[in-house]
């Protein structure tokens, strides 16, 4: 510290005894020295002093010293030492971290670095100036420039990304630094690129096309792959930034055979269990698994996901992940993330699902991996994150896998019990469903629910499942046991939510299940009591909403085969005991709950605590599709619920009704034709949109390649012009001509694609107009049909009133009507017959 003080005195000169200048005065003198000194040595000493003061007096140095430091960068580029001082000082001023020297300075705010960053980048040329010093090979200058740009990006990411994009060869300069032989420079550039590529797809594409994947894999290999240090982690984080939510880079990664280069990194050594997992290896493996998931996450384009899943199976990456699943000594967080990765690799791919189904755990006796995972899921001693991951993996294993769903249900049927002592998926799910652990109840109910998704035949099969009862009594069905558990007071709310989800998905589109539920004793009374209760707890509101939804399913999918439990009977029960408005209000409580908004976002189950596990993605999808229909159905019933039939009408009224029905049938035929036409137009519209998306993606790739070619062309032109008048050698001229020709070809292709894109847009617009016209016509026809139905109802009501009035007026007089002599002296004819 004394050396620092003596250095500053050397620059500023000695002061009078007893007069200690303030920090602001000291900085002001140093700034004046930088501005006014003609000797380079004096300016260099002043910059060195400013750098020393910038850690403790950041505000003073930043407020006064930024303009002279920029001036140094502009004018003294030939001296590497003064440039390094200027860059280091600016880096200290704009950094977001707090220095130990300024910890006791109350004037330094938390975001002071961000404020100085904003001041610095107000002039875009400042960033270009700093970028220029990346070409300087001197270690101090290059590293200081990299660190300054990194600090600027971390403070103002979006603004710096835009400035670097327009900077000449900006991204290319940064990518070239990855090949620097000095590891410190290379590692700092990795940190810079991590900040630069966050959330900017254009920069991500440029970095990827600058051969980033090859360079990153080379660095990872040199550093020891997953057993390497923190540099490996930085490379994988950058790789993750390039792939996440970027379909172009994902396609490029797949087509470049980089997935095959990931597979060896997941192979564990023979002595891995003995050596153990270091904290850095855990971090590296976690990043590797996130890279895999970035390629196959369900939010990606479906064709990209399917292609990556096939490659992962062929390259044995899935096999390596399954080996990790079954290995011992794997840390819990790595095991959890591996289960999530396996889940997304197999989701919707039958070959991958079959391979996972064939994996056997190294136990005695050997058991399928799925069974071992389910054992962990229903074990309350396991970590919550691990149990959630197992459920997600089981859901993905059953997703669009009818054979897998059937295998689960078959293990519950009596005829499938070939080995009573062997554990099966069905037995484990029933064990969890009837456990005393509420979380195990919820997990098992959701898992069993997913074995029924979009499979009505299995819903019918599951009705045949019988459960033994204590005391040798008559066995009861699984559905009956679920309703019994739901009605028990000791059954916790989370368990009830799981059962309500299972029953709702079971009943949807399955009249047989609805009939079985209505036949169970006390179920409808319990649901009615739940809806009539006045609870004020948010979770009780959710249960009431789910009970209303289950009751609505009993109306919607009721085949009217049970006397006293028909659609009209249940509707009258709702109207008289609950009320239509109250029922619809409680039905809507599900969508108002925060658990609904969480579950709707994604299929993966995420929860910080066990209490957050309430609703599942598939249940929310079912509720979203049927809620409005059920509300409309219940609201449409009258209090009396009496419907007129054609048998109660006269011949004239029946003829009128038949006429109206004929009109309605004709309108129905027209509506169906319009709906079919609308579906065809929508399908054609979807195909055009898909084709348009492909063209836009191709255009984006061509634009990226065009940008690179422009950059290469500019670099080639600069090399030719800097040849100091010497004639260009034939190879350079040929390369330049080839580059120009290729650029022209890309320009022409770009123009062609633009025209084709415009044509597709016009076609899409025309199809949309046609679809809108069809929709308008359909709406008009539906309105006419509704008007006719209302008119028909009015006519029927009038006819009924007329018939009642007529019967009241004519019946008494017909009993006393006199006889009229018939012509020719025949027998008398009653007046009623004569009138007819």
From Swiss-Prot:
User: Which residue spans adopt a coiled-coil conformation according to this UniProt entry?
Assistant: 663-707, 744-806
Name the domain of life: Eukaryota
Record's protein name: General vesicular transport factor p115
- Role according to the record: Essential for maintaining the architecture of the Golgi stacks and for normal organization of the transitional endoplasmic reticulum (tER). Required for both the formation of the Golgi stacks and the maintenance of the individual cisternae.
The annotated consequence of gene deletion is:
RNAi-mediated knockdown results in a loss of Golgi stacks and affects the organization of the transitional ER (tER) sites. Golgi stacks break down and form clusters of vesicles and tubules. The Golgi stacks that are present have an adherent morphology, including a decrease in stack diameter and total cisternae (stacked and single). The tER sites lose their organization and become dispersed throughout the cytoplasm. However, the efficiency of anterograde intracellular transport is not affected.
The cross-references to PANTHER family, in alphabetical order and at most eight, read: GENERAL VESICULAR TRANSPORT FACTOR P115
* ARM repeat ranges per the UniProt record: 24-64, 65-124, 126-166, 169-210, 211-256, 316-359, 368-413, 424-463, 477-518, 523-577, 579-636
Sorted alphabetically, the Gene Ontology cellular component annotations on this record are:
cytosol; endoplasmic reticulum; endoplasmic reticulum membrane; ER to Golgi transport vesicle membrane; Golgi apparatus; Golgi cisterna membrane; Golgi membrane; Golgi stack
Q: Which InterPro entries match?
A: ARM-like, ARM-type_fold, Armadillo, P115_Arm_rpt, Uso1_p115_C, Vesicle_P115, Vesicle_Uso1_P115_head
Q: Which gene produces this protein?
A: p115
Q: Single Gene Ontology BP term?
A: endoplasmic reticulum to Golgi vesicle-mediated transport
The residue range of the signal peptide is none
* Keywords recorded for this protein, A-Z: Coiled coil, Cytoplasm, Endoplasmic reticulum, Golgi apparatus, Membrane, Repeat
Q: Which compartments does it reside in?
A: Cytoplasm; Golgi apparatus, Golgi stack; Golgi apparatus, Golgi stack membrane; Endoplasmic reticulum
Give the principal location in a single coarse category: cytoplasm
Question: Per its UniProt record, what Pfam families does this chain match?
Answer: Arm_vescicular (PF18770), Uso1_p115_C (PF04871), Uso1_p115_head (PF04869)
Report the Gene3D superfamilies cross-referenced here: Leucine-rich Repeat Variant (1.25.10.10)
């Amino acid at each position: 510290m004394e050396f620092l003080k003596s250095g500053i005195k050397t620059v500023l000169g000695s002061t009078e005894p007893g007069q200690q200048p303030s920090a602001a005065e000291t900085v002001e003198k140093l700034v004046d020295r930088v501005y006014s000194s003609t000797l380079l040595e004096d300016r260099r000493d002043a910059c060195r002093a400013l750098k020393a003061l910038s850690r403790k007096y950041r505000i003073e140095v930043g407020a006064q010293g930024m303009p002279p430091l920029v001036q140094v960068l502009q004018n003294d580029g030939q001296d590497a030492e003064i440039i390094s001082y200027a860059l280091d000082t600016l880096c200290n001023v704009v950094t977001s971290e707090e220095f130990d020297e300024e910890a006791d300075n109350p004037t330094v705010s938390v975001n002071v670095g961000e404020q100085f960053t904003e001041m610095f980048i107000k002039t875009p040329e400042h960033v270009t100036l700093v970028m220029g010093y990346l070409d300087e090979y001197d270690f101090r200058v290059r590293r200081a420039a990299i660190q300054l740009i990194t600090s600027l990006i971390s403070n103002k990411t979006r603004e710096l990304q835009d400035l670097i994009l327009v900077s000449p060869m900006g991204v290319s300069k940064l990518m070239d630094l990855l090949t620097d032989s000095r590891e410190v420079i290379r590692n700092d550039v990795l940190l810079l690129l991590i900040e630069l590529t966050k959330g900017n797809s254009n920069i991500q594409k440029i970095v990827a096309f600058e051969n980033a994947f090859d360079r990153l894999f080379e660095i990872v290999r040199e550093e020891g792959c997953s057993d390497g240090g923190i540099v490996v982690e930085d490379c994988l984080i950058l790789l993750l930034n390039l792939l996440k939510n970027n379909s172009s880079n994902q396609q490029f990664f797949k087509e470049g055979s980089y997935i095959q280069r990931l597979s060896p990194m997941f192979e564990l050594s023979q002595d891995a269990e003995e050596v153990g997992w270091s904290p850095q290896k855990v971090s590296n493996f976690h990043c590797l698994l996130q890279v895999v998931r970035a390629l196959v996450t369900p939010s990606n384009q479906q064709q990209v996901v399917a292609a990556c899943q096939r490659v992962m199976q062929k390259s044995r990456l899935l096999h390596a992940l399954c080996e990790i699943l079954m290995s011992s000594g794997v840390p819990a967080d790595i095991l959890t993330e591996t289960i999530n990765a396996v889940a997304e690799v197999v989701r919707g791919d039958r070959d991958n699902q079959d391979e996972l189904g064939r994996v056997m755990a190294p136990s005695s006796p050997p058991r399928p991996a799925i069974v071992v995972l389910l054992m962990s899921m229903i074990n309350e001693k396991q970590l919550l994150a691990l149990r959630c991951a197992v459920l997600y993996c089981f859901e993905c294993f059953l997703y669009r896998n009818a054979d897998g769903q059937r295998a689960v249900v078959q293990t519950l049927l009596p005829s499938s019990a070939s080995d009573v002592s062997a554990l099966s998926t069905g037995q484990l799910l029933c064990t969890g469903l009837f456990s005393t652990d509420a979380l195990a109840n919820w997990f098992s109910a959701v898992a069993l629910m997913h074995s029924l998704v979009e499979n009505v035949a299995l819903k019918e099969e599951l009705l045949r499942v019988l459960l033994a009862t204590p005391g040798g009594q008559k066995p009861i069905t699984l559905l009956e046991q679920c309703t019994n558990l739901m009605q028990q007071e000791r059954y916790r709310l989370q368990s009830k939510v799981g059962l309500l989800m299972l029953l709702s998905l079971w009943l949807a589109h399955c009249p047989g299940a609805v009939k079985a539920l209505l036949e169970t004793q006390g179920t409808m009374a319990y649901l009615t009591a739940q809806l009539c209760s006045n609870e004020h707890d948010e979770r009780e509101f959710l249960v009431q909403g789910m009970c209303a939804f289950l009751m609505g399913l009993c109306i919607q999918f009721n085949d009217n085969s049970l006397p006293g439990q028909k659609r009209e009977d249940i509707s009258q029960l709702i109207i008289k005991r609950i009320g239509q408005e109250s029922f619809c209000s409680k039905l809507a409580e599900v969508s108002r709950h925060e658990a609904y908004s969480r579950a709707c976002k994604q299929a993966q189950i995420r929860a910080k605590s066990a209490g957050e596990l309430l609703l599942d993605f598939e249940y929310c999808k079912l509720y979203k599709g049927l809620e409005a229909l059920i509300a409309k159905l219940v609201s449409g019933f009258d209090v009396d619920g009496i419907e007129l039939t054609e048998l109660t009408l006269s011949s004239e009224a029946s003829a009128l009704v038949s006429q109206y029905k004929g009109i309605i049938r004709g309108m129905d035929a027209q509506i169906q034709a319009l709906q079919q036409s609308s579906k065809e137009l929508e399908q054609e519209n979807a195909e055009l949109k898909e084709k348009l998306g492909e063209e836009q993606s191709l255009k984006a790739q061509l634009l990226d390649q065009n940008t690179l070619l422009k950059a290469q062309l500019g670099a080639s032109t600069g090399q030719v012009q800097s040849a100091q008048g010497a004639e260009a050698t034939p190879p350079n001229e040929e390369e330049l001509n080839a580059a120009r020709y290729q650029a022209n070809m890309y320009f022409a292709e770009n123009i062609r694609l633009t025209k084709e894109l415009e044509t597709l847009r016009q076609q899409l617009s025309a199809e949309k107009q046609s679809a809108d016209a069809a929709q308008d016509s359909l709406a008009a026809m539906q309105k006419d049909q509704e008007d006719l139905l209302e008119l028909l109802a009015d006519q029927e009501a009038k006819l009924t009133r007329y018939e009642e009035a007529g019967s009241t007026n004519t019946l008494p007089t017909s009993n006393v009507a006199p006889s009229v002599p018939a012509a020719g002296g025949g027998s008398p004819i009653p007046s009623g017959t004569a009138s007819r």
